[in-house]
From Swiss-Prot:
It comes from Aspergillus flavipes. It is a multi-pass membrane protein. This is MFS-type transporter tndD. GO terms for molecular function: transmembrane transporter activity. The gene is tndD. Coiled coil: none annotated. The chain crosses the membrane at residues 81-101, 115-135, 153-173, 203-223, 235-255, 309-329, 348-368, 394-414, 422-442, 444-464, 485-505. GO terms for cellular component: membrane.
Length: 538
């Protein structure tokens, strides 16, 4: 990537998704000299690297600069990833932990509406769709840590507000805002991992991070069922507030800023104070005003979604799978209480089938993902130096896509004929394997392909999947009432079968789609005076 001072052209790196060990990739934008200069001399200030041909440009102090997030100590990386992963577990946990207590809630507020009973759960996921539109670009403008802190505090506050709600309208409103602020770790966590972890080691880390969005909604109803039965539905929110408050405190104590652009900006400001040279600027500074950068950051996720066919296709596929998960979650309580006469406390245990399947898929995919990447990126006669491509993350996705329809058919017809309760739960386990394959592989793919803009790419993905996750459960009960459990789940299974070619097409044609896609359609929105070259994202 280069920024030429003479013509103010911003170039997006064609190696944007490659090894995060490259400081230029991590920082996002690098400087190259004018065409008539063949050599570049460097002045080492001890705090940064300043190019002699661009004497006011501040860069990293070489590839081993300890200020570069990829060079942070192992302890700092583990601490940051651990806290973010914990947050990414808690906020999805809150999406479904409340579900077993809904019958108590509806009785207390004197409502018998099945629609409202489903919506009071899914409105949280709707908040997950709205929050990323602001939070992801804000993290790329202000940094990761301020967004985490603000959202953690607000999540805790709205959890308390939910516990104190006195009517259904209040609870729905507070649940929505709880979801909006709870989306921060899910949206920005992938960006934090991209900041810290080099590409060839990223698959295993994302496997840990993916536990939250997949297992949180599964474990939530198990704990929530017993808690609601013992102490009432309000205590679900009190527990969330207590845990959220503890994580907020840990974040303030230990979480460290990782976004390279913000860190370079801070270095520049520190150098200005030390040297008195007000002409110094970060190599990422393209001269835009704060307003222009804000507009750029806010609009970027939607542009990525609508202008990048690979992001659009992957987001729709993840959205369908995510919607299926929440549709099934919204019906588990009724299915197993009505069909199998499970008590409220035990009904939550039926969610464990999906959890066990997700864990099994997590261990397998986490073990093979980085191995596949390294094996496929070995040097060949065509590519003597080897090449790591985002598409190398996708083979497990192709395998996992078959588990989703198989699990749906098994769950639907076994529950319809009231076979032993373990059979439909095994079916949900197969769906869980497919879910984790889809979520992990596509998250890794987007992080590898967009790196410094990973938060915006994941935000686009999160918006689509959260909208479907909120809307499909609202239609689920009506579908089951009219079609029955057998044909209702079969309809979902047939749709999943139709979607199987999507991951296959992404793996086979994804690189070609990225190369054909003109990166300027995303990045030229920054400013009328800044033009962007094509990015192949390879």
């Amino acid at each position: 990537m280069s920024l030429s001072g003479s013509d103010s052209h911003l170039a997006v790196s064609p190696t944007l998704a490659e090894d995060m060990n490259s400081s230029d990739t991590s920082a996002g934008l690098a400087e190259t000299p004018p065409a008539d200069e063949e050599k570049r001399s460097i002045v080492d200030t001890g705090e940064s690297v300043v190019a002699m041909n661009e004497p006011h440009i501040v860069d990293w102090d070489g590839p081993d600069d300890p200020g570069n997030p990829v060079n942070f100590s192992r302890h700092i990386k583990i601490t940051n990833v651990g806290i973010v992963s914990a947050l990414t577990f808690i906020t999805p946990l809150a999406s479904s932990m409340f579900a077993p207590g809904v019958p108590q809630l509806m009785e207390e507020f004197h409502s018998s509406s099945r629609l409202l009973a489903g919506f009071v759960v899914s409105v949280y996921v709707l908040g997950f769709a709205i929050g990323p539109l602001i939070l992801a670009p804000a993290s790329e403008l202000l940094g990761r840590v301020p967004i985490y802190h603000i959202c953690n505090i607000c999540f805790t506050v709205f959890s308390i507000a939910c516990a104190l709600s006195t009517n259904l309208g209040m609870l729905i409103a507070f649940r929505f805002f709880q979801g909006c602020f709870g989306s921060a770790p899910v949206t920005n966590g992938g960006g934090t991992i991209a900041d810290l972890i080099v590409q060839e080691k990223r698959g295993g880390v994302i496997a840990i991070y993916a536990l939250g969005p997949l297992l949180g909604p599964v474990i939530g109803p198990v704990a929530g069922g017993y808690l609601a039965a013992a102490r009432g539905w309000r205590w679900v929110f009190w527990v969330l507030a207590i845990v959220g408050g503890g994580c907020t405190l840990a974040s303030f104590l230990f979480l460290r800023e990782t976004y390279p652009m913000v860190l370079l900006k801070r270095k520049t400001q520190r150098l200005i104070q030390e040297t008195g040279n007000t002409h110094l600027r970060s190599k990422n500074d393209n001269g835009m005003s704060t307003r222009q950068r804000f507009v750029q950051a806010i609009v970027r996720p939607s542009r990525i979604l609508f202008r990048s066919p690979i992001v659009a296709a992957s987001s729709v596929y993840v959205g369908i799978v995510y919607g299926y998960q929440y549709l099934m979650f919204s019906t588990f309580t009724y299915v197993f209480e009505d069909q199998y006469a499970f008590p409220t406390s035990s009904a939550g245990l039926t969610f464990l089938g999906t959890g066990v399947g997700s864990l099994l898929g997590l261990f397998v995919i986490g073990a093979v993902s980085d191995r596949i990447l390294k094996a496929k990126s070995k040097p060949t006669p065509e590519a003597p130096s080897g090449a790591m491509k985002p598409e190398y993350r996708l083979p497990p996705l192709v395998w996992g896509a078959f588990f989703i329809p198989a699990g749906l058919f098994m769950y639907g017809w076994s529950a319809y004929y009231r076979t032993h309760w373990i059979v439909p739960i095994i079916g949900t386990g197969l769906v869980g394997i497919g879910n984790i394959a889809v979520f992990m592989c596509i998250t890794s793919y987007l992080v590898d392909a967009f790196t410094i803009f990973a938060a915006s790419a994941l935000a686009a993905n999160t918006v689509v999947r959260s909208i479907l996750g909120a809307l499909l459960p609202m239609a689920g009960q009506s579908m089951y009432d009219s079609m029955g459990l057998g044909w209702g789940n079969s309809l979902l299974g047939f749709i999943a079968v139709v979607c199987i070619p999507i991951p296959w097409a992404m793996m086979r044609y994804g690189e070609r789609m990225r190369e054909a896609f003109d990166g300027a359609t995303i990045f030229t929105i920054f400013s009328g005076s800044v033009s962007v070259t094509r990015s192949t994202f390879t």
